[in-house]
UniProtKB/Swiss-Prot annotation:
Known EC number: 3.2.-.-
Protein name, per record: Pyrimidine-specific ribonucleoside hydrolase RihA
CDD domains referenced in this protein's UniProt entry, alphabetically: nuc_hydro_IU_UC_XIUA
PROSITE patterns referenced in this protein's UniProt entry, alphabetically: IUNH
GO cellular component, as recorded: cytosol
Swiss-Prot/TrEMBL keywords: Glycosidase, Hydrolase
Pfam families linked: IU_nuc_hydro
Function: Hydrolyzes cytidine or uridine to ribose and cytosine or uracil, respectively.
Gene3D superfamilies found in the cross-reference section: Ribonucleoside hydrolase-like
Organism the protein comes from: Salmonella arizonae (strain ATCC BAA-731 / CDC346-86 / RSK2980)
GO BP: nucleobase-containing small molecule interconversion; purine nucleoside catabolic process; pyrimidine nucleobase metabolic process
C-alpha cells in the first residue's frame, strides 16, 4: 500500500524537483500539496505549485496556499537563489486549475481527518503551516505518522553562519515541530550539501529526453549558477528538498542518528540554529532522526530512474 503524504513546500527549484520525484513514485500517495512562503513570496510559491502540477498533468491533487508570513516575524525570501518567479530557468506552463477555497492548514486537517491511516507530512520550506496545524488541531496529532523536514544543520548555516534558511525564516514554528512529540526526520545541510548535482548529472537527466527530465535539467542549469560562488566550495548544486522524498523511497541511501534537537529563537548570533545534542550532553531524550550522510551516486541514480517514469 502506498504511503500517504502531504507535501508542504515553497517552490523553489529543489522543491519543484521534490514534487517531480514524489509524483513519479508509486510507493507514495500524494494526498495534497500546500504552499509556504520562503523561497519566494506566498503568491508566487502557490502559483509555482500549480504550475508544476499543470506541467505534470496532476490537477487532481488538492492544493492550498498557506500562511503569508512567519508566526512572529516578517517574511524573508531567497529570491537571490531562485530568481524573480521562484522557478527561473525553464518555460513552465501557466496554472490550468485553481487552488482549493481554503487555507493550507484547513486542507491538511481535512486530509488527515479523512485518511484511514496516519499520514506523513513532508515540509520542505519554513515550518509555519505545520506549526499552525499542530497548534490548532491537537486532536489530529495521532493522524500524523511523522514529519519529514528539510531544514537545519548540525554544523554550518547557509543563511547566517549558524542557521539554515528554512529554520531561520520561522524558528518559532520549527521549535513547535521539534517539540511536538511527533516523530521528526531532519534532512539538514550536513546531508543536503553532500547531495550535490554535478554538470554531468544534469546532462544525464537531459539525455533521458522526456519533457519532464528536460525541464528538471533546465531548473538545475539555473540553480547551479548561484552555487558556483566560490564561497561555498561546491562542485555542484546541493539538491536539498528531494532528500526528504528520497529518504521515504530508499532510506538505505542515508545514514541517520537519533538525537535531541532544539531551535534557537533568541540568540544574538544564533537565531534559527538547530542545536543537535550529538553527544547526549543535555540528558534530553532524542526527538528527531537526523540525517548525517548520503550515498550521492545512489541519490542521483534514484532521480534518473524516476525521471524515466515521465517518458
Amino acid at each position: 500500500m502506498a504511503l500517504p503524504i502531504i507535501l508542504d513546500c515553497d517552490p523553489g527549484h529543489d522543491d519543484a524537483i521534490a514534487i517531480v520525484l514524489a509524483l513519479a513514485s508509486p510507493e507514495l500517495d500524494v494526498k495534497a500539496i500546500t504552499s509556504s512562503a520562503g523561497n519566494q513570496t506566498p503568491d508566487k510559491t502557490l502559483r509555482n505549485v500549480l504550475r508544476m502540477l499543470t506541467l505534470l498533468k496532476r490537477s487532481d491533487i488538492p492544493v492550498a496556499g498557506g500562511a503569508v508570513k512567519p508566526l512572529m516575524r516578517e517574511l524573508i525570501i531567497a529570491d537571490n537563489v531562485h530568481g524573480e518567479s521562484g522557478l527561473d530557468g525553464p518555460a513552465l506552463p501557466e496554472p490550468s486549475f485553481a487552488p482549493q477555497n481554503c487555507t493550507a492548514v484547513e486542507l491538511m486537517a481535512k486530509t488527515l481527518r479523512e485518511s484511514p491511516q496516519p499520514v506523513t507530512l513532508v515540509a520542505t520550506g519554513p515550518q509555519t503551516n505545520v506549526a499552525l496545524l499542530l497548534n490548532s488541531h491537537p486532536e489530529l496529532h495521532a493522524k500524523i505518522a511523522r514529519i519529514v523536514i528539510m531544514g537545519g544543520a548540525m554544523g554550518l548555516g547557509n543563511w547566517t553562519p549558524a542557521a539554515e534558511f528554512n529554520i531561520y525564516v520561522d524558528p518559532e514554528a520549527a521549535e513547535i515541530v521539534f517539540q511536538s512529540g511527533i516523530p521528526v526526520l531532519m534532512a539538514g545541510l550536513d546531508v543536503t550539501h553532500k547531495a550535490q548535482i554535478h554538470t554531468a548529472d544534469i546532462e544525464r537527466f537531459r539525455a533521458i529526453g522526456n519533457p519532464i527530465s528536460t525541464i528538471v535539467a533546465e531548473l538545475l542549469d539555473f540553480f547551479l549558477e548561484y552555487h558556483k560562488d566560490e564561497k561555498w566550495g561546491f562542485t555542484g548544486a546541493p539538491l536539498h528538498d528531494p532528500c526528504t522524498i528520497a529518504w521515504l523511497l530508499k532510506a538505505e541511501l542515508f545514514t541517520t542518528v537519533e538525537r535531541w534537537v532544539g531551535v534557537e529563537t533568541q540568540g544574538k548570533y544564533t537565531q534559527g540554529m538547530t542545536v543537535v545534542d550529538y553527544y547526549f550532553l543535555t540528558g534530553n531524550k532524542p526527538n528527531a532522526t537526523v540525517m548525517v550522510d548520503v550515498d550521492r551516486e545512489g541519490f542521483v541514480d534514484l532521480l534518473a530512474e524516476r525521471l524515466k517514469f515521465y517518458g
